[in-house]
Design a protein with these regions (language model features):
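Acidic-aromatic pocket-rim loops
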Residues: 82, 90, 228-287, 333, ...
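Append "and occasionally in soluble cytosolic enzymes with long acidic Gly/Pro-rich linkers
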Residues: 26-30, 104-210, 274, 293, ...
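Extracytoplasmic/peripheral linker and loop segments enriched in polar/acidic and small residues
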Residues: 122, 214, 218-229, 256-324, ...
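Aromatic-rich, solvent-exposed beta-strand/loop patch
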Residues: 21-50, 71-90, 168-173, 177-187, ...
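Ligand/substrate-recognition segments at binding pockets and active sites
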Residues: 168-247, 291, 356-359, 363-371, ...
Length: 561
């Protein structure tokens, strides 16, 4: 499938392309085989200044996700560095906890949206490198919607909204009064990562808190340790927070983030929005029988989201990744994901030393992975590790953005009757032969069946929207899996795969939340942990606070020919 892409304004495209001299996947030779290096060492460097120093002196070879203009300019000036730029499926946002008063009031969230000066933020913090965004899908998405309700920067309008709704200023405290209680509003906080880990995010929290204080809202920034922050978000113990999503081509992220069924502990509906009209539209998107029906539902859902503001979206950033071109080549820029993101299989497979073969590439990890459990991992830092250990049934061609066969050599999409008069989707996967788990166990259709049923039966929040409609999985033979959904949807093809779990490891795991497979030795194979994948790299060592080391999978089914 190839989704229609929204064309960014030509002027912006030209300016950014000229600024970075970026290359595209079509200009880079890439192969569907690898990996070309013997190991990846991922030094954990949280401090932004230390990251830049390490890259410039050659201590790291891959510096992903640059955001600070000063860092970008320093890298551009380094004759041994190459900076790639790709428009991203990226969205930076302020999230409100709509379960808590007073942030359950639409007016309050709309007023806060009015005091956020996107243009000034982008100019002062990013020197114009980011793209202002108010919509709930980025411009690189084929489902981006431009014409939505907006709350442009206008502090005076924010004051008028609050005054008209009864949030008048208490003369004694200078704080606005909650019309429900007649008392000054309680103090509210904006969680962000720390300045050391994400300086621009922390600074944005401060800027927005100060803008809110200027209209008499008692809001303060609260930078904190990132793993602690994630724990609080999972438990809905927050007022507001600022983070970014790295999305995909598929617009059902709207369902995952905003449908009421996903308002559960550790679920993706972190704002806790519950809106019957919105739910109906999101279900129309999720179960759309065609791209046309999906687009209509997505458009209408985005209008409601823009009006209600469970998030206030600030900007979308191009992915800017730096590589030491004096030492490595073979990195593949990819629309929507960049050249260094874990979703980009092609750089992982194709990166190689300029001289010689094999060797070690040092790939920066900007934050400590909290967990290396595929059922509970949620941050990009965790998946930067895990994403290189697993393969999927399909991959994305980096030039055309079309689906291409991977572990599945082919597939069919059909229908069946879950009950008389009702139509459901059935996906039939035909697997490649010879694929093995990293402990040499053959990968078969039974692994697909076990994984999908385990995720469904255990209601794993990270995957619940993918598996909740699965009725059964059949395995006619070792290389054929048939996944039956109780409903019909254009998108079920993308829910019938995923990060598969080895049954002999996971069948006895009763509590996936507390399972720490990276800390437990494999029961039979020395040197392996219970994090067992089938991808190009094996988890070799994780030394907390120092590094993660991945080694080349010697039995990878796509080894270079």
């Amino acid at each position: 499938m190839k989704l229609r892409r929204f064309l960014l304004p030509v002027a912006i495209c030209l300016v950014l392309a000229m600024t970075y001299g970026s290359v595209t996947a079509g200009q880079v030779k890439w192969e569907p085989y690898g990996p070309q290096v013997d190991q990846i060492i991922m030094p954990i460097i949280k401090d932004a200044e230390a990251q830049l120093i390490a890259f410039n002196r050659g201590d790291i070879d891959v510096y992903p996700g640059l955001t600070r203009p000063a860092d970008i300019n320093v890298v551009k000036a380094n004759p041994n560095a190459e900076l790639t730029m790709n428009y991203g499926f990226h969205m930076f946002y302020l999230c409100y906890n709509m379960r808590r008063e007073p942030l359950d009031a639409d007016i309050l969230r709309q007023a806060i949206a009015h005091v956020i000066d996107r243009d000034n933020i982008i100019q002062t913090l990013f020197e114009g490198y980011m793209l202002p965004l108010a919509a709930f899908l980025p411009p690189s998405s084929g489902f981006y919607k431009e014409d939505i309700p907006r709350f442009p920067y206008n502090p005076e309008e924010a004051k008028k909204l609050l005054d008209a709704a009864g949030y008048t200023v208490d003369p004694a405290t200078g704080i606005r009064i909650d019309p429900k209680t007649g008392k000054p509003l309680r103090k509210m906080t904006i969680f962000t990562p720390t300045y050391e880990v994400a300086p621009t995010s922390a600074e944005l929290g401060k800027i927005i808190a100060e803008a809110c204080q200027a209209i008499n809202l008692p809001i303060e920034p609260e930078p904190m340790d990132f793993p602690v922050m994630l724990d609080k978000l999972d438990m809905a113990e927050f007022d507001m927070y600022m983070l970014a999503w790295s999305l995909s081509r598929i617009p059902t992220s709207l369902y995952n983030f905003f449908h009421s069924s996903n308002d559960v502990e550790a679920g993706y509906n972190r704002p806790g929005i519950r809106d019957a009209e919105l739910d109906k539209l999101l279900e129309g998107l999720y179960y759309a029988p065609s791209e046309e029906a999906a687009r209509k539902a997505a458009d209408e859902a985005q209008v409601i989201l823009a009006r209600r503001q469970p998030y206030t979206v600030l900007y979308s950033r191009p992915y800017m990744d730096a590589f030491r071109k004096d030492r490595f080549t073979g990195y593949v820029p990819m629309h929507g994901y960049g050249a260094a993101n874990y979703t980009n299989k092609w750089t992982t497979l194709n990166i190689k030393p300029v001289k010689g073969k094999g060797g070690t590439v040092r790939w920066l990890l900007m934050e400590e992975p909290k967990v290396l459990n595929p059922c509970t991992a949620s941050s990009a830092y965790e998946w930067e590790v895990l994403g290189r250990l697993y393969d999927d049934l399909m991959e994305i061609n980096p030039e055309t953005m079309e689906d291409i066969p991977w572990m599945a050599k082919s597939w069919e999409v059909g229908t069946w009757e879950p009950e008389p008069g009702k139509t459901g989707t059935v996906i039939t996967w035909h697997l490649e032969k010879g694929i093995k788990w990293q402990d040499t166990t053959p990968f078969t259709s039974r692994d697909i069946k076990f994984t999908l049923e385990y995720l469904r039966d255990n209601n794993v929040p990270r995957y619940i929207s993918n598996v909740q409609e699965i009725v059964k999985v059949e395995t006619p033979d070792d290389y054929t899996a048939k996944v039956y959904f109780e409903t019909e949807s254009y998108w079920h093809l993308y829910r019938a795969g995923g990060n598969f779990l080895p049954e002999w490891i996971w069948k006895d795991v009763k509590d996936y939340k507390t399972f720490e497979p990276w800390l437990e030795a494999h029961p039979e194979v020395p040197g392996l942990t219970k994090v067992v994948g089938h991808g190009p790299f094996i988890l070799d060592q994780y030394k907390v606070g120092e590094y993660v080391r991945l080694k080349k999978n010697p039995i990878y089914w796509r080894l270079s020919k």
